[in-house]
Amino acid sequence: MTMSDTTDSTAFDSGHFRTIMGHFPTGVTVVTAMSPDIDGTGPQPVGFTIGSFTSVSLDPPLVGFLPQVGSSTMDGIEASSSFCVNVLSDQQSDICWRFAKSGVDGARFSDVDWHAAPSGSPILDRAVAWIDCSVEAIHTMGDHLFVLGRVGALDADADHDGEPPVPLLFFKGSLGGFEAAG
């Protein structure tokens, strides 16, 4: 069954839906890419904050995320045919908010240290982990896209200056860290 096979028999406020979904904690990622040279200034880094990231398959290794339809950042990712998912640490809430705002992608990267993944996509320094992918498929799902990526390379930062990294989480409209007990 597909979305087009169903009839929307449940009408409710989208704000209420968002509030209820906010009770489910999610990890915070910044998805990045190097947008191809489209204006003669050379490839440009693009990226946005994504909370809807998930693993999809182990064999083959696939991941997915859901950006909003109409995102100019997504246009750059689609044009590059690759992306890197950066799992943010609890010390990177400023980066989360910076990349969550609409605007010029280049400004998002000012004063943010990064280096290139094998695909050329930016790996943000001090991220908990990064996953470099090629775009496998893109599907429209309501007001969002589902982007499926095939994992080409990945790694985790096992040590932030002698301390294990703590991932950043989003829960009920706020950001915080998570440390496993034991």
Language-model features, listed with the residues they occupy:
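Basic, polyanion-binding surface patches
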Residues: 2-182
